Amino acid sequence: MGSLWEQESGKTRFESLNHDIKTNVLIIGGGMAGILCAYMLHQSGVPYVLAEAETIGSGITKNTTAKITCQHGLIYDQLIRKFGMERAEQYLKANEDALARYRDLCRNIDCDFEEKDSYVYSLDSRQKIEKEIRALEKLGVHAEAAAHLPLPFSVAGAVRYPKQAQFHPLKFISAVSEGLHIYEHTAVRELAGTEVLTDHGKITAKKIIVATHFPFLNKHGSYFIKLYQSRSYVIALENAPDVHGMYVDEAQTGMSFRNYGSLLLLGGGDHRTG
């Protein structure tokens, strides 16, 4: 099955690497994180190269529901309890700064950027919602509790986080990637010190940023051993109502909702594979 975002955007193409090169910074991975790293280095005048195994935006980026929000579940109560106020404030500020940067970038990009309120709801625990509201108040966020949502089921409660956003990720990437130093169909096969081997060329870099969805190289931490595969699904429904916001269940196996044009994007069904 294809991605709605692929159907709605033009394709930006880049050549593959076929010779040896040297640069200051190598970015491995051409999703949202990698492209934004390349864009910021480009704006700062730092020599860089981005290597993407397939095509830019062809991984997680094209399959996301494309919400831009500081609200990642009921996380702030947990952050304060586990790590303290200072760390929670740092996390919040980093996300607020990122949202502001997206907003500034999208002013001049046709990527269907829309400001929306974001909601995290719970089906069975009003107490969790109240704890999160108190945590956000401590952090200076004007969040509100909501008891009734325009969803096809009742909820115990929800946290409303105002002025978040949604957009079209591939339209955004297509615009931002113009003029960037990118090689597509350039898979990294081996990394040794400051040298990276691809199928048809070697890249020597002073610094290397791995911006892949998971750590594909067996380096410090052996993170690949700790990973497991999971899968979730998103469908685009026609003739569905406008839910006037972005919604996600606080439970890992719950559902998320947002509109795109006349469509309702419904995500859920998260499960481990294998």
What positions do the PLM features span?
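N-terminal Rossmann-like FAD-binding beta1-loop-alpha1 element of flavoenzymes
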Residues: 21-50
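Glycine-rich FAD pyrophosphate-binding loop
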Residues: 43-63
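Hydrophobic anchor at the start of a short beta-strand
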Residues: 46-48, 143, 208
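Dinucleotide-binding Rossmann-like beta1-alpha1 core, especially the glycine-rich loop
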Residues: 71-147
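Active-site substrate-recognition segment that forms the wall
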Residues: 108-114, 202-203, 210-274
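Helix-loop-beta segment of a Rossmann-like dinucleotide-binding subdomain
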Residues: 110-120, 145-175, 269-272
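Helical element adjacent to the flavin cofactor pocket in flavoenzyme catalytic cores
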Residues: 134-136, 158-207, 211
